[in-house]
Amino acid sequence: MTMITNLKRSFTLENIRELAKYLKGFIPNIQDDETLLSFLDAMYTHDPDDNFDILYHGFMFRGISSNLLLQVENIDEMSYASWSKDIDVAIDFASKQYAWHQYLLIRYGWAIDLAKVKTIALNQFDAPTGLENYNPSREKEVIAPLIHSECVILDISGNNRKPVEDFEQSMRI
């Protein structure tokens, strides 16, 4: 059983409502419950034709190819500058193609403080491509800190970083 399965099962209606309240404050287009529910539903929907799976690769924009990041191998050896550039490219692409998405909820493979989180595996949970020498022991070392304390809301401009303190506790597994 993957941590993703555990995380998904750990979400109660109360947890979702807390997350929803927080997201409403940061995503301008979410003005009603119906839109919000659609947004939340998308976060747990895998569409192979769209090459889009928020849950497996962090909360990502619809239409961004997961391969944009998964094609990177040996992430441990990548420099901060190179890794940052790849993230910026993805964010820039998203902002142009899907401007209504104002913010990204960063989890799992997307890390903001790369000085603190040195090693990130984007495919640690059943992803079809990516790191060939992924060590499951890194799940606890790298992913757990992201789940428990490194969740952030990232302004699409990349200039505004806000800790997700309002619902951090409810997201713990």
Where are the regions a protein language model picked out?
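Conserved NAD+-utilizing ADP-ribose enzyme module
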Residues: 1-55, 73-81, 85-173
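Short hydrophobic beta-strand segments
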Residues: 54-67
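Short aromatic-glycine-(Arg/Gly/Cys) micro-motifs in beta-strand/loop hairpins
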Residues: 69-71
